[in-house]
Amino acid sequence: MPFITQVYAREVLDSRGNPTVEVEVFTESGAFGRSIVPSGASTGEYEAVELRDGDKSRYLGKGVLKAVENVNTIIAQELEGNYSVLDQVVIDKALIELDGTENKGKLGANAILGVSMAVAHAAADYLDVPLYQYLGGFNSKQLPVPMMNILNGGAHADNNVDIQEFMVMPVGAESFRHALRIGAEIFHNLKAVLKDKGYNTAVGDEGGFAPNLGSNEEAITVILEAIEKAGYKPGEEVKLAMDVASSELFNKEDGKYHLDGEGVVKTSEEMVDWYEELTNKYPIISIEDGLDENDWAGHKLLTERIGSRVQLVGDDLFVTNTKKLAAGIEQGVGNSILIKVNQIGTLTETFEAIEMAKRAGYTAVISHRSGESEDATIADIAVATNAGQIKTGAPSRTDRVAKYNQLLRIEDQLGSTAEYLGLKSFYNLK
């Protein structure tokens, strides 16, 4: 039987050189699972707590030895010899109860999630099936449309661009493999476009370019130029997406949005006007966190104005939390949720959020964090849930490409049953 014999955690490094938690789960059958927990740069204030040591003499206070110790003592004592790795929901529930706090602040969401994911990997190993098939069953066959962050600003880059992410979505591709090729070709052409204009071509946290530009709108125009230079049609084969990360722009003192790169200050209503103008002018199909996470009136207004034709994704707004999402659904706020496993802390709660979104006609976009690793679990989650969309950076840097390569493998494994729905993945739009 696949009963857990050992749960072991260690401190490893993420893609930004910061410590994170790696967990290994061993079973009496010999089945084994390993996972590495991701970490965010711009975080919502309602996210589950990522436990950091705070010891400034180690890793500038970002060590995770407390979280590691919690896995190797409290969690290990609870799980070893008592649970089968096939009991994912039971184990996740036990971990939540063991922590006992609303935000997983006692043991740390990074400790709990590491165990939750490693257990799933061990179960798939025991059953000798791919992780996506174990998590989703025989009907897991939809490859996601990639939301590829090719130009970075905000908290993800040291430049004057206020908007955190500008992305391309190859909605007109015939397969995931084709979509990835389109994205990569646009990425390389963007480098050439930026170089021709005398802009920097260094990359940010998520692999996208991070130049200083004349305005936020110029980021859109250089990407459109790169799409055409690569031989594709903007608006037909390729749509644009933005993650504004507005909570990073919001000033609590005056209640306004400060776009420091442009030297502009906007009210909530002016931000909505701006998005309406941009989406009328350019082929933008998705906007994430267009307003501050606590500006629900602004989000509601944005949804009323453009929500029928533009995907409005809640990241900091919903933080992968079913209570937050339920409130959004009830109030008509947004039409999509960003799914980040470490915002909530267990696979069970992650899947509950995805199911709730789908039942309400909201899309669920599976997402990485800016601090990633070689762990590609989210690629399997995207296919397991037939989510239809994944956001995991540029086709650059191994920590991002690891997810894309895993999706290529999955598409190969699925063979003729694999589906890539492109624009049909946006079932939330009219």
UniProtKB/Swiss-Prot annotation:
Binding positions ((2R)-2-phosphoglycerate): Q164, K340, R369, S370, K391
Q: In which pathway does it act?
A: Carbohydrate degradation; glycolysis; pyruvate from D-glyceraldehyde 3-phosphate: step 4/5
Q: How is the cofactor bound?
A: Binds a second Mg(2+) ion via substrate during catalysis.
Where is it localised? Answer: Cytoplasm; Secreted; Cell surface
Q: Name one GO molecular function term.
A: phosphopyruvate hydratase activity
What reaction gets catalysed by this protein?
Answer: (2R)-2-phosphoglycerate = phosphoenolpyruvate + H2O
Q: Which CDD domains match?
A: enolase
Question: By what name is this protein known?
Answer: Enolase
* Active site positions: E206 (proton donor), K340 (proton acceptor)
